[in-house]
């Protein structure tokens, strides 16, 4: 079997093209989408991620605002900045780059971001709304994975999907989105005793466990579609390179389609961050119009 390599870069380019069109429409209505990015400290990997996000925002026509805080800044200072951005009507999305320094409570900081501006989809209001099937801002990586799956498979109804990993960022929201698409969903994790056997039954496998090449061909059903979320840096004969959670070369002869690492899920995450920013801008503009109309009606 010759597997199809799912091109995340090409798919992301299509999503960003639609985002650009949406931004153009919003600007014609007097709405300029804006994304505020907060970086605490100077972690090299975070610097790269931030730079990539800002470049994509500029390409899409989204105004980006960069806020940098020193690594030793207090949690109170970070929360004060978030509160200021929450009330700034010119800012539609707030992105807090993770990880944060150890002395700052990550959960507190993420929860402080207004749900309407939470373009990462991590606020409890958005998490709860996702589980209820409401129209909320959803986490970017799972949303990107779903887009790739729908482009690759079409209708997902009735397919058996296994999600490997139960993180709040990928595993749990991924399972919720697959359920919304009418899949039968199994989540396996570090305490699962039959993870391999469950994966062998899956039409769709989403790997998000953070262990390099953990899943080989023996885990996979012939013809399965594999979305590899893992990004792991390994030493390969003295050279550093990125690999996924799936042994890519080993799986190629078994699966029908698979995402590469890099070039698979990563570009989709940033594309859906931009998409969420535009969605947030549109929703906020609608809410402000509705509020203004309500005020006018109350006057008359």
UniProtKB/Swiss-Prot annotation:
Domain of life per record: Bacteria
This enzyme's EC code(s): 1.5.1.5, 3.5.4.9
InterPro entries named in the record: Aminoacid_DH-like_N_sf, NAD(P)-bd_dom_sf, THF_DH/CycHdrlase, THF_DH/CycHdrlase_cat_dom, THF_DH/CycHdrlase_CS, THF_DH/CycHdrlase_NAD-bd_dom
Keyword Hydrolase among UniProt keywords: yes
Key words of the record: Amino-acid biosynthesis, Histidine biosynthesis, Hydrolase, Methionine biosynthesis, Multifunctional enzyme, NADP, One-carbon metabolism, Oxidoreductase, Purine biosynthesis
List of residues binding NADP(+): 165-167, 190, 231
Coiled-coil stretches noted in the UniProt entry, renumbered to this chain: none
Function: Catalyzes the oxidation of 5,10-methylenetetrahydrofolate to 5,10-methenyltetrahydrofolate and then the hydrolysis of 5,10-methenyltetrahydrofolate to 10-formyltetrahydrofolate.
Protein name: Bifunctional protein FolD 2
């Amino acid at each position: 079997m010759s597997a199809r390599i799912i091109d995340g870069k090409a798919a992301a380019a299509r999503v960003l093209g639609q985002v650009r069109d949406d931004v153009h429409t919003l600007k014609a209505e007097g709405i300029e989408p804006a994304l505020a990015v907060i970086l605490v400290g100077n972690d090299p990997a975070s610097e790269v991620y931030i730079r990539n996000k800002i470049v994509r925002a500029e390409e899409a026509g989204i105004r980006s605002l960069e806020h940098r805080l020193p690594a030793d800044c207090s949690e109170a200072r970070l929360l004060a900045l978030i509160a200021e951005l929450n009330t700034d009507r010119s800012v539609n999305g707030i992105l807090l780059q993770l990880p944060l320094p150890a002395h700052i409570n990550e959960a507190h900081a993420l929860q402080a971001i207004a749900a309407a501006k939470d373009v990462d989809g991590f606020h409890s209001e958005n998490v709860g709304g996702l589980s209820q099937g409401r129209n909320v801002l959803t986490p970017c990586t799972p949303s990107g994975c779903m887009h790739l799956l729908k482009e690759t498979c079409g209708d997902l109804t009735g397919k058996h999907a296994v999600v490997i990993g139960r993180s709040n960022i990928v595993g749990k929201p991924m399972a919720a989105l697959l359920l919304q698409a009418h899949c039968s969903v199994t989540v396996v994790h570090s305490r699962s005793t039959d993870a391999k056997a469950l994966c062998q039954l899956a039409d769709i496998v989403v790997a998000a466990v953070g262990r390099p090449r953990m899943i080989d061909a023996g885990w996979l059903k012939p013809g399965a579609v594999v979305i590899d979320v893992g990004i792991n840096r390994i030493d390969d004969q003295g050279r550093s390179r990125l690999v996924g959670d799936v042994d890519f070369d080993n799986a190629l002869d078994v699966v029908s389609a698979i995402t590469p690492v890099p070039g698979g899920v990563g570009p989709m995450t940033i594309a859906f961050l931009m998409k969420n920013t535009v969605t947030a801008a549109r929703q906020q503009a609608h809410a402000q119009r509705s509020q203004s109309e309500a005020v006018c009606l109350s006057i008359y």
